[in-house]
Amino acid sequence: MPFDELKRWESSLQNEGLINPRCRKAFHVNRLLCFGIAKSMPVFEKLILSDQIAHLRHISYMFLAFTGPYLAWELGFETWTRKDGAMPALVFKSSKYAHDQRMIRWSEIAFTKSVAKFKCAALTNVEYALLIAMIFTKPGAEGLSPEGKDLLYDESAKFTNILLRYNQRRLGLLEGVQRLDLCINLINAAIETEHILRLMLRYHTKYYSMDSIDIQCSNFIENLIKRTD
């Protein structure tokens, strides 16, 4: 992104706040990407329709919370940065949030500290691909049928074992187990990041004026918080 365009975007982002058009577009693109990856996995087609919907709702924002900091680390940035140069943390440089220590702290945890964990881990491409597969087979969605949970659990266990064997071959038996633990902690960190992002949305809707938010955006926020989209 050219510097002058980046400055215009930064100014627009700070004026429009947390739920800006670029943010909403990014969420929609993320959902499409998430659906495409899920469809490419054989286990997804084995799930009944209601399980597919519940599963996608469960993993879509965890997927964003995992890939956001990974992409920033891959691009060499210290905070969430997409390939178009967009940085969500810039929102909180706005005077609107200047004295809101809670939002600033949450922003640091979600958008900056999460990247530091990926920088420390320095995942290989194989590890990243297998962790994505583990996220897409995580059987924790509310409303999943027992059969759906079993299918996803078996698939998740398969990818976990592949990741373990991969690291044991290249690092050693004990070191491979330790590396697996570090990798799984990145998924747990993504779950924490997703939780923080939802806290930020709930807090924002409660304590900040929504007068400039249209009905479509209001519904978008509610769907994000409740996972009903």
Protein language model features and the residues they cover:
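Nuclear receptor C-terminal ligand-binding domain
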Residues: 1-229
